[in-house]
Amino acid sequence: VSVILESRGCKEGIQPLRSSRESAGTADGRCQDTGIEKSHAILIRKTLLTETSLIIHWCSREHGFIRTVAKGARRPGSPYAGKLDLFYTAELAWLPARKSDLHTLKELEVTDFRLGLQSSYLRVLCASYFVKLLEGVAEVETPVESLYDLLRRALDYLTSHEPTRKAVLHFERELAHDLGVHGDESAAPITSLRQMLHRMPVLREELWEQLTS
């Protein structure tokens, strides 16, 4: 599924989407003439910008947490219809903003819809908690490749499995290990994570109460 919006591309047009490291432009993933950035990313939130446009929040492999504007996404017949939903993975291209962290989405190709993840409230709740945890420990627009991979694996699991307390503890433990804050295997990983966060996501309490062991 490919969506193109007001895309100018390089001199000969935008090439098929590739990761930053495989870009036909510069080595850092920019199209040489336009400054277009490219990355694999997971859609983690969308908010209303105007009557016709959305702000899309992403967790990307190469650029960390970023925000893009999807212009005209809410217009009738928009090419974005059905292609901007929570926890989709996509290859995207955007034009970086010069004076803010709100960039302009230029091209989008969905690579994984994760339709099974939307099949239950608990799966969505658990996925949302995982996202909140990562947002609490990662800097905006800072590469978080290991955290991206952790989230991707967790979402893939939730696509075909209901969450359990064991699964949540596994995610928290993996995150704490990745951050280098979980040295005591006998202690709950959430204890280590609390040291890095000002406050734990409120979603955890609701999630924990509804989960089985």
Where do the model's predicted regions map?
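Intrinsic disorder/low-complexity segments
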Residues: 1-31
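Non-catalytic alpha-helical scaffolds and adjoining flexible linkers that form interface surfaces
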Residues: 2-4, 31-213
